[in-house]
Amino acid sequence: QVHRGPVQHACYPHRAEAIVDSGKFDWNAHADKFPGLTTPDESYHGVTYTERFGLEGAFITKATVQLMRDLGSIPSPNNCFLLNIGLETLPLRMKKHCENAQAVAEYLQGHEKIAWVQYAGLPGDKYHERAQKYLPNGTCGVVIFGVKGGRAAAEKFMAGLKLASIATHVADAKTCVLHPASSTHRQMTDEELAAAGVSPDLVRFSVGIEDAKDIIADLEQALANV
């Protein structure tokens, strides 16, 4: 998996005719929620908009019956102002996110207490060639990895971080960390976690735009106590 935003993804050279970005990530350096068009909407008896209304009608139907209902017909002036402010620095921030994430992935890959690292910017990653082709402006800012020792070790590592914030969202200007098995996926059994691809040792690390040396130093001191 690769978390990628509109800055990294070279859509048009690969025959994309139109690009729609939700603004969920990256735009203003903070996270928000934009429900998908291909997932069931429980507020309307589980309807999936793309299946019910087709590709041409899905977006406008969802925008009318759900988003306009919940959020109003247009963003508030203040939200538009904040998004515009964020867009002014979007290329600079995304470049830093990607550079820092690459440095973090390379550091973790060689650490004795890390079992595995998944980041498409690493030459050995199974998605590396695709990232090189489709993400010429940088891979992404999210690194996932496993801490040796399983769930207990992963939780202890996360609790020992001082710079990174424990948070469920990604693509924030600050570094955020999450242990899915004990948080977002805690309601699942071990069998369900395995089926979902969430191992007990998995840590999701959303790399911010702080100095890379500070981020790595935080990782180092937290891993030293595991």
Pin down the residues of each PLM region.
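Catalytic PLP-binding core of fold-type I/II PLP enzymes
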Residues: 1
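Active-site C-terminal subdomain of aminotransferase-like
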Residues: 5-142, 146-176
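PLP-dependent enzyme catalytic core of the Aspartate aminotransferase-like
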Residues: 93, 152, 159-160, 175-226
